[in-house]
Amino acid sequence: MSTITFVTGNANKLKEVIAILASSETDSSSSSSSLSSSNKVGKFTITNQSVDLDEVQGTIEQVTIHKAQAAAKVIDGPVLVEDTCLGFNAFNDLPGPYIKWFVQSIGLTGLVKMLIGFEDKSAKAICTFGYCEGPDKEVKIFQGITEGKIVDSRGPTNFGWDSIFQPNGFEQTYAEMDKKVKNSISHRYKALDKVRDYLLSQ
């Protein structure tokens, strides 16, 4: 049985990955901050560790590849890393991979105000996972995209920009959705579905 370390210090992100990727025995409502030994995908056991990694600028693919390679060296084994971006179509996909810094600097209200002068409120949520088997190994990329629009903040604001993103075909923001619903349509789900298929094929 091989072990893959999901590298994150974000408890909310970890819970979603548990709910989507790990075994059906895992309760997605669990408040645990670490994965149990029952979390298996095919021949792999998924564990988790928080690792301080240098942040680089570039496309989301470049950022993910760098993060996976750096994490594999620290862990000295197979790792799974994730990078998420939110792109406003009116801004040619900005903030993109820099969304975390936008949230920290101008907040959710500031992000909504960026689009005040634009009719086009459409946006895309992009999740990119990188899997690396170990130091100096090739990084495999798995990406999921969910289209939607930017709206005034609705719902809990404790998970990034979830409260201002309303996916197409729904009247609720990510933050307002039941977790099971969100985890069946989100950009993270779509990317992890590809990760799962890959791991099961190994």
Curated annotation (Swiss-Prot):
InterPro entries tied to this protein: ITPase, ITPase-like_fam, RdgB/HAM1
Main location: cytoplasm
Top-level class of the enzyme under EC nomenclature: hydrolase
A GO biological process held by the record: deoxyribonucleoside triphosphate catabolic process
Compartment annotation: Cytoplasm; Nucleus
Binding site for ITP: 8-13, 67, 83-84, 100, 159-162, 182, 187-188
Cofactor info, note text: Binds 1 divalent metal cation per subunit; can use either Mg(2+) or Mn(2+).
Catalysed reactions listed for this entry: ITP + H2O = IMP + diphosphate + H(+); dITP + H2O = dIMP + diphosphate + H(+); XTP + H2O = XMP + diphosphate + H(+)
EC numbers on record: 3.6.1.66
Gene3D superfamilies: 3.90.950.10
Presence of the UniProt keyword Endoplasmic reticulum in the record: no
One Pfam family, short name: Ham1p_like
One GO CC annotation: cytoplasm
Required cofactor(s): Mg(2+); Mn(2+)
Keyword Phosphoprotein: no
Database matches in HAMAP family: HAM1_NTPase
Function: Pyrophosphatase that hydrolyzes non-canonical purine nucleotides such as inosine triphosphate (ITP), deoxyinosine triphosphate (dITP) or xanthosine 5'-triphosphate (XTP) to their respective monophosphate derivatives. The enzyme does not distinguish between the deoxy- and ribose forms. Probably excludes non-canonical purines from RNA and DNA precursor pools, thus preventing their incorporation into RNA and DNA and avoiding chromosomal lesions.
Family: Belongs to the HAM1 NTPase family.
Oligomer and partners: Homodimer.
Protein name: Inosine triphosphate pyrophosphatase
Natural source organism: Candida albicans (strain SC5314 / ATCC MYA-2876) (Yeast)
